[in-house]
Amino acid sequence: MSSQYSNVENLSPQTIRQVMRELQEMETTPPEGIKVLINESDVTDIQALIDGPAGTPYAAGIFRVKLTLNKDFPLTPPKAYFLTKIFHPNVAANGEICVNTLKKDWKPDLGIKHILLTIKCLLIVPNPESALNEEAGKMLLERYDDYSQRARMMTEIHAQPAKCGVGAVGDAKDDGGPSTKKHAGLDKKLQDKKKEKLLKEKKRMLKRL
């Protein structure tokens, strides 16, 4: 995130300390399926990786999300976005997330961990009644199988570890050596073939709609 959009200088030192303390606690003891990515130079730019929950169309995907703290935080809620493309009723085309916790149900004592857990829960139980993506909301209510297939397809295309530049949330980082690059090349070929196949399936599915 560019420093020109940073609100660090607008936050109180107490708020900055509280946010950093919570992020460091989450880094040491991460919630299940969530990994925070700390930007020590700008605590208003918070990113995390969320594992797609098992039993949902998002399973096996890894989703990068972003929280942006404004100058009135924690009196006002942060903005939340999916940086990974996702087909979900409560996620707009620009990635903005609609959830009551970040709107009418916001309380200043709700922390970053609570927000990230709420976003993960949204992957398990979408709320089509307050949809930002009306197509996804309508499809979920009226043709769930089609919704599930579309969401799963988007997950397979956009939410794989290679797309996020990371391994699974629990994986160790590689050292970027020759062996890693060799495997990356093979993985890319396999992913390209898989993507081509998925796009063909998507076209067939869209023709049936």
UniProtKB/Swiss-Prot annotation:
GO terms for biological process: anaphase-promoting complex-dependent catabolic process; cell division; exit from mitosis; protein polyubiquitination; protein ubiquitination; ubiquitin-dependent protein catabolic process. Residues 168-194 are annotated as: Disordered. SUPFAM superfamilies: UBC-like. Its EC number is 2.3.2.23. The keyword RNA-binding does not apply. Residues 14-160 form the UBC core domain. Pathway: Protein modification; protein ubiquitination. PROSITE patterns: UBC_1, UBC_2. It catalyses: S-ubiquitinyl-[E1 ubiquitin-activating enzyme]-L-cysteine + [E2 ubiquitin-conjugating enzyme]-L-cysteine = [E1 ubiquitin-activating enzyme]-L-cysteine + S-ubiquitinyl-[E2 ubiquitin-conjugating enzyme]-L-cysteine. GO terms for molecular function: ATP binding; ubiquitin conjugating enzyme activity; ubiquitin-protein transferase activity. The keyword Metal-binding does not apply. It comes from the Eukaryota. Residues 184-194 have a biased composition (Basic and acidic residues). Belongs to the ubiquitin-conjugating enzyme family. Catalyzes the covalent attachment of ubiquitin to other proteins. Acts as an essential factor of the anaphase promoting complex/cyclosome (APC/C), a cell cycle-regulated ubiquitin ligase that controls progression through mitosis. Acts by specifically elongating polyubiquitin chains initiated by the E2 enzyme vih/UbcH10 on APC/C substrates, enhancing the degradation of APC/C substrates by the proteasome and promoting mitotic exit. This is Ubiquitin-conjugating enzyme E2 S.
